[in-house]
Regions:
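Hydrophobic positions on the alpha1 helix immediately C-terminal to the Walker A/P-loop
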Residues: 16
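ATP-dependent small-molecule kinase phosphotransfer cores
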Residues: 32-103, 107
Length: 202
């Protein structure tokens, strides 16, 4: 089963992905976590250190190249894996970032989404931008403006693909979010990651 997690920065994508895979492995199941980052955090830190800001189109070009490479490599690894595969981010995230910056969707990323194996479940972790902003400030590894998070949330919900996403409330304690995720996976036809398996791992 292939699951993709999306959502604004601070929505808890990485935390939920890591916890889901850990729960599945603890229950005796085969599970694989794949990260489809675009290098935004590193580029932001580098820009801040150098005191320069890359134009949105240049930043998008670099991010798209990095994310596309990671997504293609992730699908290559997922193809031969038997078990639960959780992808932390996907190409939809780049399309939402383009929307946030007022850039066109283009043709390449939507085409790539269509030809790649379709995930069994694309989960959108929905959180109030103010709570997401507080989480980002608390972790202290990067920074985001509240207005950008609000704009990104709007951009996600404006994606043509969004109606096919499973929207989960991501506010509150991580344990509650994880329970909602496991229930969504079960509803989509997969076994709950936290239920023990008597089968041998692949």
């Amino acid at each position: 089963m292939l699951i993709v997690l999306t959502g604004i920065d601070g929505s808890g994508k990485t935390t939920a992905a890591e916890a889901t895979v850990a729960a599945a492995r603890q229950a005796g199941k085969s599970a694989l976590l794949l990260r489809n980052y675009a290098g935004r955090r590193r580029m932001s830190l580098l820009s801040a250190r150098l005191g320069i800001q890359a134009p949105p189109r240049l930043a998008d070009f670099l991010e798209t190249a990095v994310r596309t490479f990671n997504v293609l490599n992730a699908h290559r690894r997922a193809r031969n894996f038997h078990g639960l595969v959780v992808m932390d981010r996907h190409l939809h995230c780049q399309l939402a970032l383009r929307g946030m910056h007022g850039l066109p969707r283009g043709r390449f990323l939507p085409w790539l989404i269509r030809i790649l194996p379709r995930p069994d479940l694309v989960i959108y972790l929905d959180v109030d931008p103010r709570e997401a902003h507080a989480r980002i400030l608390a972790r202290g590894t990067d920074s985001e403006r509240l207005e950008d998070l609000e704009s990104l949330r709007d951009a996600y919900q404006s994606l043509p693909e969004f109606p096919r996403f499973t929207r989960l409330t991501a506010g509150g304690p991580p344990g509650d979010v994880l329970s909602r995720m496991h229930a969504a996976i079960e509803k989509a036809g997969g076994p709950r990651p936290d239920e023990c398996s008597h089968a041998s791992p692949h």
